[in-house]
Design a protein with these regions (language model features):
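Conserved donor-nucleotide/metal-binding helix-loop-beta segment in metal-dependent transferases, i.e.
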Residues: 89-122
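Short His-Asn-centered micro-motif
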Residues: 14, 39-41, 85-86, 109-110, ...
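Generic structural signal for small/hydrophobic residues in well-ordered secondary structure
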Residues: 36, 87-88, 137
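Short glycine-/acidic-enriched loop or helix-start segments at secondary-structure transitions
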Residues: 21, 47-49, 92-96, 145
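N-terminal anchoring/stem segment of glycosyltransferases
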Residues: 1-81
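Short, conserved loop/helix-junction motifs that constitute active-site signature segments
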Residues: 30-31, 76-78, 98-102, 136
Length: 221
């Protein structure tokens, strides 16, 4: 069995519980993680032996989910990195894990190369990356506890949020407020690495086979 002791596997879910249980159990089938945790306000049935349950306040909306991911995930992680998965995004090819992924503070499936989308405050298209299956360092998780990371990124003239998701936590961390995380030393994976790590959409530079996925059109199961 593959051992990845540096990484805590996380899923945060109060809805879609059967799919969330499937996703985290599937991600544990051939990997022994540093820790594996199901986060939510109610303990689900059917978790495999490797998965611990840790209670959160109720996650009643997508905004609750996004806020928790930005400001509270750090409380659940004691390893150098965590892998955040979703009910519709999980490990599918454990053999494609690469320890070089740990060189980065954030990796997620690339977004499209579009001059009118995923624009940071300086109008630059940021392509990495999707949060639905994403590797994050403890350093990145701790940034909001050290400096101010604005939540209201859909207000004012500083932010350019074309197609970057308003309150979506991955848009906040990787687009709107990326400069804040980079100023704290966080390094985002290049597209060439992110394309090997995960896939969300079919893009010209997509890899056919990846370590994980999020919301792929293909029925992975």
């Amino acid at each position: 069995m593959l051992k990845i002791p540096e990484v805590t596997l996380l899923i945060l879910a109060d809805l879609d519980l059967p799919d969330a249980v499937y996703a985290i159990n599937k991600s544990c089938e051939e990997i022994e993680w540093g820790a594996a945790k199901f986060l939510g306000s109610k303990r689900p049935e059917g978790l495999c032996d490797q998965v611990e349950y840790e209670e959160t306040y109720p996650i009643q909306s997508i905004d609750d989910f996004n806020f928790y991911c930005i400001y509270n995930l750090t409380n659940h992680v004691r390893t150098s990195h965590c892998l955040l998965i979703h009910p519709d995004g999980y490990v599918i090819r454990p053999q494609l894990w690469d320890n070089k992924f740990l060189d980065y503070d954030y990796i997620g499936a690339p977004w499209r190369d579009d001059p009118n989308a995923y624009l940071d405050p300086w109008g630059r298209n940021q392509r990495v990356g999707n949060g639905g299956f994403s590797l994050r360092s403890k350093r990145l998780l701790e940034v909001p506890s050290k400096v101010t990371v604005p939540w209201e990124v859909n207000e004012g003239t500083f932010y350019k949020h074309q197609n970057a998701g308003l309150y979506n936590e991955d848009g906040n961390i990787c687009v709107h407020n990326r400069h804040i995380f980079e100023a704290q030393g966080c390094v985002y994976a290049p597209v060439s690495v992110a394309s090997k790590f995960s896939r969300e959409d079919t893009l010209p530079d997509s890899e056919e086979e990846t370590f994980g996925f999020h919301y792929h059109f293909q029925d992975i199961r």
